Amino acid sequence: MILTRRSALTLTLAALAAPALVRPAAAACSFPDLSKGITFKRQDGSRGLARREGDGTVVIDYVTNRGSWLDRRRVKNGIFEMARVVEESEEPVVGASAPDYKWTYSPKITLPEDGATWAGRVKEVVEVTISDERGTVERQRTRWDASYRVFDPREVKLSGCSYRALSAEAVWQGERGTISQRWVYFPELGLGLETKRNGRANGIVAMGPA
């Protein structure tokens, strides 16, 4: 068959357009595994990493991309923080170590399920090591009355994956004032991530495997 120049041009244009008509299937959701590590991003641009340890607790680094800024927490049952080391500065801080918080709860903490509540006493110990010849450790103890509640079951979508989610809130009251927190908890992952602290929101905008 002999093609005219117009026919050849028409076939060429059709061939070039063909790939655009065949759209690739949507990429499959890459569902994260907490034992292998889960990365996330918050509204303020901070990127974090969560990973389940061998003892079942979860270590969450809330800031991994802002220089010397440090916010590392050890969590049990999704939302109960057992320890936290925090230094809110992008530049190195000299003269003392970052404050190291540890908490114990009484009575026994619960699992976060829709409608679950917990109320009890929290004992806090915070230590700071001074950079002197003796490596002096300053220690402060505080007791809090705390209450937790879990509510609002729903589905959320992050980075192309859909997750079952719950909201959780906590209020701590003591001689140092009041602390309030909110998390989004993902039952299928066993992971809770803070989205609000003392009235300041900082939600999760992306999440995926490490």
Residue ranges of model-derived segments:
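C-terminal segment of N-terminal export signals and the immediately downstream linker at the start
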Residues: 20-29
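Generic hydrophobic alpha-helical segments
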Residues: 15-16, 167
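Acidic, serine/threonine-rich low-complexity disordered tracts
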Residues: 28-95, 99-102, 125-210
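Surface-exposed helix/loop patches within compact recognition domains
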Residues: 108-122
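N-terminal secretory signal peptides and thylakoid transit peptides that target proteins
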Residues: 1-15
